[in-house]
């Protein structure tokens, strides 16, 4: 028996295929820069140093996007350090974390990216990581070793540790 297709069925099939193509090979990096720099008021230099290390240890593709969140007090120095990123600002307890989580869900990153890299060890992101993984997104966490929450670690399949280079002894 042949099942009749409606316009809605054809549209849903087309958009579903389109979403898969849109996701293919793309990643988004959600960066809680305060957590990565270990400072609530990171300087432009501190952000640049952390990002140099980040780029050295984290695979970044040509189609990758970056979303960076900070509190309002750090907006200018962080904004100077970054170019071509989506910069979010929210103050208060977990303000930057909330801004990143809301952006991920609101912008439907589960449908737009194959891979999400969470640049933070904060346990606040455990629920987001769980949701993304349930949606079929590969989730990686990038964190300082001592800043990685056990709860967040339990929700992801991959962790990359940011370790500052050991100073050369002369």
Predicted regions, residues:
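Nuclease catalytic cores that cleave nucleic-acid phosphodiester bonds
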Residues: 72-170
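Domain-level signal for Mg2+-assisted phosphodiester chemistry and nucleotide/NA-binding surfaces
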Residues: 2-99, 138
């Amino acid at each position: 028996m042949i099942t009749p297709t409606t316009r809605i069925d054809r549209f849903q099939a087309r958009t579903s295929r389109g979403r898969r193509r849109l996701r293919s090979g793309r990643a988004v990096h959600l960066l809680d820069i305060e957590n990565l720099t270990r400072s609530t008021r990171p300087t432009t230099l501190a952000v640049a140093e952390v990002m140099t290390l980040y780029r050295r240890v984290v695979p970044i593709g040509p189609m990758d996007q970056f979303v960076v969140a900070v509190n309002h007090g750090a907006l200018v120095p962080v904004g100077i350090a970054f170019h071509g990123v989506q910069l979010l600002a929210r103050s208060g307890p977990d303000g930057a974390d909330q801004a990143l989580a809301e952006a991920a869900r609101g912008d439907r990153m589960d449908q737009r990216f194959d891979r999400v890299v969470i640049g933070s060890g904060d346990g606040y992101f455990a629920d987001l990581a769980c949701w993304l993984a349930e949606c079929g997104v590969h989730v990686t966490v990038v964190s300082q070793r001592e800043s990685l929450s056990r709860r967040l670690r339990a929700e992801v399949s991959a962790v990359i540790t940011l370790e500052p280079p050991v100073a050369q002894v002369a």
